[in-house]
Amino acid sequence: SVLFQGPALYNSAYTNKLSIVVTPLKALMQDQVKELGEKGFISNVDYLNGDRSYQEVKNIYRKINGGEIAILYVTPERFRSRAFLNALSSRMANDHGLEYMIFDEAHCISQWGMEFRPEYLNVIKTCKKFKDTYGDDMCISMFSATVTDMIYNQINDVIPVKRLGQENDKKIYNPIRSHIKMDFKLVFHDIPHRLKEIVDYIKEHNIKSQESRMLIFCKTRNQCEEMSLLLADELHKAGILSKELSTQAIGYFHAGMDGDDREETYKRFKDNNDPLYILCATKAFGMGMDIPNIHYIVHLMPPSVMEDYLQEVGRAGRNKKMYIDAGFSESNPIPTLCLFSKDDIKKAKEQLLQSTLSWKNLEEIRIAINS
């Protein structure tokens, strides 16, 4: 994220132009704004999402118009808001455009924009209008560690892009660093068997809570909450945690939580002095979240999309000094584990097929719109 934050903040100090960062997850934008605030960028960096109150949103629109914000984080859905577009247009008219239009986790443009989140296509169309109005001075930038050749080609079909820092014929690098080891284990489909594997994993690695954190990725919000309770009980039975500590050491995190609860859980998980060191999370914690000492990752079951898996595994070992102090290195890599059953693979294929619109579906939608 510093690759776009640095230029945006530096240039804005001279041009006073606004940079927009389009990001797919609320938790991700709040994390980045919080980190910038800790570095002293308090009044000129902000975010807009559904957790903000009416008064907060109104105040941010005022700050946009007044030229007080240098970087604004938004979800793609925000570009459906007439009030937002009005505030943005007013600022752009005064400044003759934006400094940067930035797409963070840009692989989501294709992965979700084509299949699940048409809002991304709407944002790109809006960007094209901006460029038509203000010319090529407005830079559109896309950032991601997990853009495959297929996703790159899909994005390029919508809006021409150029890879920076590599030759045109050079393959995209492997986003998984050499100090991370990925293991996969075939298990029975039911939750009790998966739970036992996770307990065995925790026993085997003897996790020290004051130097390491552990993530358990679950598919659904209910799974997160259920797993946190079941695991607390099993770790108590196994003698790994006391009854009192088991209720404090394990938590859950997902986008359906109240904003304050989600923020509190994130703060606790990041604080090495807090007993919370195992977090059951959905993909809401899988992109861009920067906890420096996550040294253990387990997937309860594989994600439906490979890019999600790479992003989630990529949460591990973000701080070299911390993972070396915890005993990890290229010769003794951080252990990640993905549990899967034959039924998981079958269901993933079914979900991908169900997510594709057929001509029959499109015809039904057309009839419904016209009726």
Where do the language-model regions lie?
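Conserved SF1/SF2 helicase motif Ia
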Residues: 4-44, 131-137, 211
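Conserved RecA-like ASCE P-loop NTPase motor core of nucleic-acid helicases/translocases
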Residues: 18-24, 73, 140-142, 212-220, ...
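Conserved nucleic-acid-binding Ia/Ib motif block in the N-terminal RecA-like helicase ATPase lobe
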Residues: 20, 26-74, 249-253
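Conserved two-lobed SF2 helicase motor
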Residues: 63-87, 269-289
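SF2 helicase catalytic motif II
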Residues: 70, 77-80, 84-135, 139
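Interdomain hinge/linker at the junction between the two RecA-like core domains of SF2 helicases
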Residues: 130-133, 137-139, 146-204
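C-terminal helicase lobe
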Residues: 205-231, 235-285, 289-371
